[in-house]
Amino acid sequence: MTVVPVALVAGGSRGLGLEIARQLHRCGHHVALCARDEAALQRAASEFKERVSIHVMDVTDREGVQRVVKEILNGYGPIEVAIHVAGIIQVGPAADVELEHFDQALDIMAKGPINVAWSVLPSMRERRRGHIGVVASVGGVVSPPHLLPYSTAKFAALGFTDGLAAELMGTGVTATSIVPGLMRTGSHDQATFIGNATAEHNWFSVAASAPLISANSTRAARRMVDGVLAGKPLVTITPLAWMAYRVRGLMPGITTRAMGISNRFLPRATGNTVPVKGSKLSVSPVVRRLTHWSRCAAARNNEV
């Protein structure tokens, strides 16, 4: 009997996580989709005719993650691949950011990868086989303005995965840091915005949709999965991410000053600290036209 390899995707119900799940399924894996929203999981799973299971899981709940991993191991067999994609995007000036925004970002995008990795590692080490992938971001290499909680968490995720990869060398288990730039996944409407929420949503959604600076999410997901399965320690997606790595390493001071200059062109703080979801904001006809490709991606990737 042919053994079907199992892949766990944390944050696999929508957006980039769903794109990664599709690529793993294409490679012949049974895909265990994990996310908090059961309805979103059911919608995502409906496009797969076989080799799929859904698991309600919150990556911030350590015991819950361990319980789901045990459920997958007992029900479907050894987990060969585990990729952490779950995330939250909070956009707004630092003056309007509250400490709880950092807590939310760190719990999901810094502690989440640790919870997933520490739950799958024992069985992977025992078999001396397995691949762990963590989706970080170019925001974990260069900290752009108005994304401070997000970048703080992504820097932490990148440091964790880089160190884990070094310690796993020679064990048969690999860890891959995935560093994408902007991608057209449709996630801008799932992001939350503080300060001048409409103005923040406008610049962010247009940037995430622009073909010249954002990547096609399907092609990006394919490269990510290929890199994780190959056991590469680092996979950079998009020229922007590649350039950020090199420029930040060679000229850190200049990079920070460049970010400071770009901050001058972004909306000012207003004192509004209450996050507003992007999908709740009205947008102008011009912005709708400029975000056409991202809205198409949102429909395809269950970003509803």
PLM region descriptions:
Residues 13-14:
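Conserved glycine-rich cofactor-binding loop
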Residues 27-43:
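Conserved glycine-rich Rossmann-like NAD(P)H-binding loop of the short-chain dehydrogenase/reductase
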Residues 137:
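Residue(s) in the substrate-gating loop at a strand-loop-helix junction
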Residues 170-241, 256-257:
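SDR active-site lid
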Residues 56-67, 99:
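The beta1-alpha1 cofactor-binding region of Rossmann-like NAD(H)/NADP(H)-dependent oxidoreductases
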Residues 117, 153:
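Active-site helix of classical SDR
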Residues 93-94, 101-106:
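Substrate-binding pocket helix/loop in short-chain dehydrogenase/reductase
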